[in-house]
A protein has these predicted regions:
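Short, charged alpha-helical interaction segments and adjacent helix-coil junctions
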Residues: 1-12, 69-71, 76-81, 166-288
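Conserved single-residue anchors adjacent to enzymatic active/cofactor-binding motifs
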Residues: 1-202
Length: 288
């Protein structure tokens, strides 16, 4: 079991949800590197939390892969989505709008919130632009220096990983399973910590939990299949019994008609209405 868990751990990369959750949690350097490369400027991250749960005013719960703040009160939500079709723009827009509520909970006045970024790394061109990085400014606010971008949604196509540009190197690092081959030191160290260091036990426990969940789901699925199969057999048996009873009733009906049993008596014996007997006799080709 231990070797199986470690083998699964060694196959994981930063695009895998559970591994990413453990690797990036609290790692300001690694998350700062991600944001800095995507925005093409140095960003100093002051706070990081993975799997940040937020509940809106209607009671709807959302979970953000990575929630971060920098030392200038800018806010970042970073999502990792292997299926680009699931990286829907409305979903990211909703995340962006929820960010302000989180920041206020941290004690930052609403008026001091500067910019809100939602960065989504996907294994494909979710933005349909053909670019490695696609940015959409969704809101503007007036400042004493004029209009300033307020909400920004950014898609990063992880498959755009050829060349030596920082974003291409980053994209290769995100899917690299062997942490020793990761180029950026910050990412290499956060992966090493989970695969060989103090985070390994946490990650192995999570893998065991996933395995237990999968086994439980498989048992539940198997039990459901057995139940459905038995119910199908019962339904089939009921239909066969019904058909057999109807066939027997028709045989009795035909026999009684051929022996000139009165209609009223036939209805009494077979517990059928006059109309039903007449209809069934017609279908059997019998003459009353």
């Amino acid at each position: 079991m231990k070797k199986t868990v470690e083998r699964l751990l060694n196959k994981m990369c930063l695009m895998d949800d559970t591994f990413m959750t453990v690797a990036f949690d609290g790692d300001r350097d690694a998350v700062g590197l991600l944001v800095s490369i995507v925005l093409n400027r140095k960003i100093n991250i002051s706070y990081v939390q993975t799997q940040k749960t937020v509940v809106n005013s209607e009671g709807k719960k959302i979970i953000m892969d990575v929630f971060a703040m920098d030392d200038e009160d800018n806010v970042y939500v970073i999502e990792f989505e292997n299926n680009p079709n699931r990286a829907a723009y409305p979903r990211l827009e909703y995340y962006k709008d929820m960010v302000s509520n989180i920041v206020v909970q941290f004690g930052t006045p609403y008026s001091k919130i500067r910019k809100r970024y939602v960065i989504c790394f996907t294994r494909g061109d979710a933005a349909k632009t053909g670019q490695a990085v696609s940015q959409t400014v969704t809101k503007w606010k007036d400042t004493d220096k004029g209009p300033e971008s307020y909400g920004v949604i950014i898609y990063v196509n992880v498959k755009k990983n050829e060349g030596d540009e920082p974003i291409a190197v980053l994209n290769r690092d995100l899917v690299q399973r062997d942490f020793r081959k990761i180029k950026y030191r910050e990412l290499r160290e956060c992966c090493r910590r989970v695969k060989e260091g103090e985070g390994k036990k946490i990650m192995c426990d999570k893998i065991r939990q996933m395995q237990a969940t999968i086994r439980e789901e498989e048992r539940a699925k198997a039990a459901k299949m057995v139940t459905e199969a038995r119910e199908e057999e019962r339904a089939k048996a009921r239909e066969e019994e019904k058909a057999k009873a109807e066939q027997q009733r028709n045989a009795y009906l035909k026999l009684m008609i051929e022996n000139h049993i009165p209609l009223e008596k036939i209805c009494t014996i077979l517990q059928m209405s006059v109309e039903t007997v007449i209809q069934q006799a017609y279908l059997l080709g019998c003459v009353l």
